[in-house]
């Protein structure tokens, strides 16, 4: 349809306003699992590198990271997060116990699928950034359920669904990336709209 690209631009601008983001930092994907697979398979990992996560993650994404680990010989490190959480400080301290000089990626849910916890991510993202660790957030259940300001949260990558609490049709989701890490992304499918100098768009 000749209206497809203008409509997609309109969607990105409306979504950016709702999510506290810039339109150029957002792309539309079919669901958060697809967006997170794009991110995960774009990570340049080596043997011995570590991917840090929690024991509250969505099963499909656990399989995604297992596949990445198998392909790259990176190691998955999973920390146990107690229920209930008492504070953001406690959460950050727990996640820090899993960090080492080999940790390259931190992958956490914003709202967990199996346990419905809202992880207080801002402090742990800042801690990871100070250590040079890439932060990736599974936001499948967050948009529309909690207030989001992606620029303020300041993760490296975030993917969320719009068909849950935002009441959009299935097939409506987004991938967000901070501008300086966007060249890391490699699309799973290359077609119209790919921009070579960015490595994808």
Q: What is the meaning of each model-derived region?
A:
Residues 1-201:
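Pyridoxal 5′-phosphate
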